[in-house]
Design a protein with these regions (language model features):
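Non-cytoplasmic
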Residues: 72, 149-187
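C-terminal transmembrane helix and the adjacent membrane-cytosol boundary/short C-terminal tail
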Residues: 112-123, 127-128, 135, 195-231
Length: 231
């Protein structure tokens, strides 16, 4: 049985907290953006879409540095937020923001693909029966896209757990405050005689990611089978 040290347990708790808060604050905006990209046509859509997915192709250090310039204590926005207690640089809230920026495109893409697979005629039928656009979305689109939303949520959560470049650039590597799983592994690899601890964290990361992705695949198949039986 693998026994974690108190420091490793603290790292795991912090990583899960950062990933969970990131997902909670990303889910509604990502669903809205995904719906807009899936259902609406407007001038500048290609530019908007490019901006949404840009973090996927940028070196993670670039978004991290931009976040530091924007939300650092002396940043463009950070200097005005700091007096209200909203400080992001070099604390766990900044780690949430960095993870959200890097995981948001994955969440949007998964939800967008799920919404695009929903037959728009079902939405129109709901509206014909008296549902508003919002009601049709909540009662028809959202339930039918639930498997894609779950998969996207798990991908975003796992991406947050593995975020390194943007996090270390924006919030540093502070024990007990911003040191998540990948940062802890990086720190241990800089020290002698820590191979066993590194392997424990690697096995822990693999276990969490494997279980999360397995559950997403299982739930997706379950939903498909359920709809097949319903039909």
């Amino acid at each position: 049985m693998m026994i974690l040290s108190p420091e490793e347990i603290e790292v795991l708790k912090l990583s899960c907290k950062v990933a969970a808060v990131c997902l909670v604050f990303s889910l509604i905006p990502a669903t809205l953006v995904a719906w807009v990209l899936a259902r609406k046509e407007f001038w500048g859509k290609s530019l908007f879409e490019t901006l949404v997915f840009l973090p996927l192709v940028l070196p993670p250090v670039v978004p991290g540095y931009l976040l530091l310039q924007l939300f650092g204590n002396r940043g463009l926005f950070g200097q005005y937020l700091a007096p209200f207690g909203l400080e992001f640089a070099f604390n766990w809230k900044g780690a949430v923001l960095a993870s959200a920026v890097m995981g948001f495109p994955l969440l949007v893409q998964s939800i967008r693909l799920a919404i695009e697979l929903v037959d728009q005629r079902l939405e129109m039928a709901a509206k014909t029966l008296g549902a508003s656009s919002f009601g049709a979305f909540m009662q028809v689109t959202l339930p039918l896209a639930s498997s894609g939303i779950l998969v996207g949520s798990i991908l975003c959560f796992c991406r947050s757990l593995g975020e390194f470049g943007a996090t270390i650039t924006f919030v540093g590597n502070i024990a007990g405050e911003t040191r998540t799983l990948p940062l802890a592994m990086y720190s241990l690899m800089q020290q002698p005689d820590t191979e066993a601890a590194v392997w424990r964290l690697i096995i822990l990361s693999l276990s969490v990611a494997f279980f999360a992705l397995w559950f997403a695949q299982w739930f997706s198949r379950y939903q498909k089978n359920k709809r097949g039986y319903s039909a």
